[in-house]
Amino acid sequence: MGPLSPARTLRLWGPRSLGVALGVFMTIGFALQLLGGPFQRRLPGLQLRQPSAPSLRPALPSCPPRQRLVFLKTHKSGSSSVLSLLHRYGDQHGLRFALPARYQFGYPKLFQASRVKGYRPQGGGTQLPFHILCHHMRFNLKEVLQVMPSDSFFFSIVRDPAALARSAFSYYKSTSSAFRKSPSLAAFLANPRGFYRPGARGDHYARNLLWFDFGLPFPPEKRAKRGNIHPPRDPNPPQLQVLPSGAGPRAQTLNPNALIHPVSTVTDHRSQISSPASFDLGSSSFIQWGLAWLDSVFDLVMVAEYFDESLVLLADALCWGLDDVVGFMHNAQAGHKQGLSTVSNSGLTAEDRQLTARARAWNNLDWALYVHFNRSLWARIEKYGQGRLQTAVAELRARREALAKHCLVGGEASDPKYITDRRFRPFQFGSAKVLGYILRSGLSPQDQEECERLATPELQYKDKLDAKQFPPTVSLPLKTSRPLSP
């Protein structure tokens, strides 16, 4: 049969059918034209994602992004970089932050809902919902749940206590009495009892800082003098809450005294932390109680030594895109590398290996936290797929590098002495320099806005969000009895 003539085609299809078919073909052609071009407009020239590259979000079914978030910002663990991406995401999506009056929620005291700016307790008037709680606090679940819904996504980050100790010593040397009295970290770890006193001002920075930040109670600790095993306990012990297996809301209360006086038998010997990290603070059963509670509360705990891998898993858990978790490192100290791992001890000198072992032994509760959440992270990686993860991590790093070259002078962080714009100069504290960023000139207005979000330090970004949520009221000028000068 020969080709159909126009008249025969019209008889077979009919005018209406031909119109529908023509519309379909035109729609497909228009869509292909759109998709074929560079349609990512946020940063022209930086379209790194190729059509064949795997997406972090599942193809089918699609999932809505999680936007009720509780991030426990632990100290000296890379948490400022996570905070930066939360600031940026919430700012871009018009989300409402639970903000402190200044920059921390009364730390080192336990978190209280009353410290959230704009918080109204029940019966105190209409309460606008909060989406993100993410600034420094000592975790207190009972009070957090006064501010955030129980189905929020809870997450945090931990770091190898050996690396954390190095960073904390240089940063908090003037704050911690134990660090201040010690000439060096090596001297402190060689004889920590000669410097450290439980309960002394700022000395929570000197031992088991992660455990402290997570709001966990501390067991009785032996003192150097007189062998007293009854030091002062936490004056405000947290009321721990446990999420029972298969339960919905985080609700069930656990008596912290059960952790202070644990049973002596341990059934799972694989989860014990071997000597020297066992030291003298807390039995294995005490530690396992604490870890079980954290598992019941937190949906994800990131690991600083595997920061990029953790970001990919975070994006997957939140159903966010890759660009949502691509950012610059913040609050990094000069001479320190984010993600530098001491876990394997490979490449360390004998002196460094000794310091690492002593730091983990002294911070044995933090070491238990780290080992536990390192294992849980890698179990999550196995479930996600290592090949898929490697592809996503490579894409994330390529995107970060391209953004740095596009946004920053020299394509990298800068010494703070060269940062003249106060909006981008990070707060300097402690003996180590905290690096910041200098933006390139000549950026388009759209690129300038995006690069500013990426480069803004945490304190300045918090102030920006504060002004956005609580704009200053315009007051009338005061009347004066004297005439004004011309």
From Swiss-Prot:
It is an enzyme of class 2 (transferase). Pfam families: Gal-3-0_sulfotr (PF06990). Optimum pH is 6-7. Residues 1-18 are cytoplasmic. One of its GO terms (molecular function) is galactosylceramide sulfotransferase activity. GO terms for cellular component: extracellular exosome; Golgi cisterna membrane; membrane. The chain crosses the membrane at residues 19-39. Its cofactor is Mn(2+). Glycans are attached at residue 374. GO terms for biological process: cell-cell signaling; glycolipid biosynthetic process; glycoprotein biosynthetic process; glycoprotein metabolic process; oligosaccharide metabolic process; proteoglycan biosynthetic process; sulfur compound metabolic process. It comes from the Eukaryota. Its EC number is 2.8.2.-. It is a single-pass type II membrane protein. Keywords: Glycoprotein, Golgi apparatus, Membrane, Signal-anchor, Transferase, Transmembrane, Transmembrane helix. It is found in: Golgi apparatus, Golgi stack membrane. Signal peptide: none annotated. Pathway: Protein modification; carbohydrate sulfation. The keyword Acyltransferase does not apply. Expressed mainly in placenta, thymus, testis, ovary, spinal cord, trachea and adrenal gland and at low levels in brain, lung, spleen, prostate, small intestine, colon, stomach thyroid and lymph node. Residues 40-486 are lumenal. Catalyzes the transfer of sulfate to beta-1,3-linked galactose residues in O-linked glycoproteins. Good substrates include asialofetuin, Gal-beta-1,3-GalNAc and Gal-beta-1,3 (GlcNAc-beta-1,6)GalNAc. This is Galactose-3-O-sulfotransferase 4. It comes from Homo sapiens (Human). The lineage of its organism: Eukaryota, Metazoa, Chordata, Craniata, Vertebrata.
